[in-house]
Amino acid sequence: MAQNGTVKGFCVLLVVLGGLVLAGPAARAGEGAEVRGIIQKVEELRGLRTGHPLAVSTLDAVAMRGVVARLLERERGSETEAGWDDALHLLGVLRPGQRLAQVERGALAGQVAGLYVPRTRRLYVLGSGGSAPRAVVAHEVVHALQDAHFQLTRGPLAPRPRDHDGELAAQALVEGDATDVQSRYVASLSPLDLVGELGRTLGALPGGASAKTAPFLERQLLFPYTAGLRFVRALRARGGQRLLDRAFRNPPRTTAAVLDPARYLAGDPPPQAVRLPAGSYRFATSFGAEDLVALTGEGSLGRFWLGGRMGVGRRGLDMRLATRGAASVAAALRRALPASAAIVFHGRLVCVRIALDKASVRGVSCR
């Protein structure tokens, strides 16, 4: 997973939140023949074949936390991370003194059940006594197949710091595919396997509950799995495996297309171009339909979104959104953003400015 910079381009995480594995209970997986059996079943379900042996490491909770911490550390200090820190503070998502990397570590510490690292082509899965739940192995095997056939860190699936919305949409395709295969794999297990291995699966659940994560960040953490799963199932229902594989070569451009698969199936129109006010921005990226929904907590606004950008400069934060219902979007943003935010709209354009000194900004232009 790589929400807002979480291990972007280095690994894909299967996250366990609230004590629930996203795909449900699964059976035991050790080394050797059993793992090969899981790989063969996943290949059958996904319609892809591995081109090389897969390296699978089963870790205990302490070792898994160490792997995740090292991967998070690789991204520290980047300009993108600093830009997100500033933006999320100004938007009121982060509290004074908080840092995005700190929140991410807290949210993910002890909550990761498995990950695949494209750089090393290694799968790490959490297990008890040397055994990992089969569903976790299956999920990460899908990522290995995706990487072998479509390259998770290059081309259309590569990280895009200046297009956060497009990057999140592509991530939803990746995680939705893995979650879909994972759930179908679990459904293929016998009732005896499911019941008999429930205790082992619960024993392998990550521990160390994290502190409460801000709703915006929590939703973006789950979005690739939940919305991505619905998106992938819609593609498979329309065009089967061929359409899904085509989507990996032409990922959804926006989270609006993930939230509404009909948009993607109708040709996946690009977002409406939106320009920020003239000035120098040390950080600028797209602000998408999912960002709008996560920030306001109002799911219906996703269908209003047409395009958007956000930038942070010396003056503070500027945001421009093209929408179908500017008055409704502006009203929702007024409810969600700090009181210091100046929010106006003109026609279909919604304009937001939040000053670095938290002072109210007057006379914001929205032309």
Residue spans for each PLM region:
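Short, compositionally biased low-complexity segments enriched in polar/charged residues
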Residues: 80-118, 276-317, 329-333
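Active-site recognition of the HExxH zinc-binding catalytic motif
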Residues: 42, 135-152, 178-179
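Acidic helix-start/capping segments at beta-turn-to-alpha-helix junctions
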Residues: 52-71, 159-165, 195-205, 251-252
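A metal-dependent hydrolase signature that marks the N-terminal structural subdomain at the beginning
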Residues: 28-99
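Pan-zinc metallopeptidase signature
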Residues: 208-315
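C-terminal soluble interaction/assembly domains
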Residues: 308-367
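Short pre-active-site segment immediately N-terminal to the catalytic Zn-binding motif
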Residues: 123-138, 169
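Post-HExxH zinc-binding segment in Zn-dependent metallohydrolases
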Residues: 148-153, 157-201
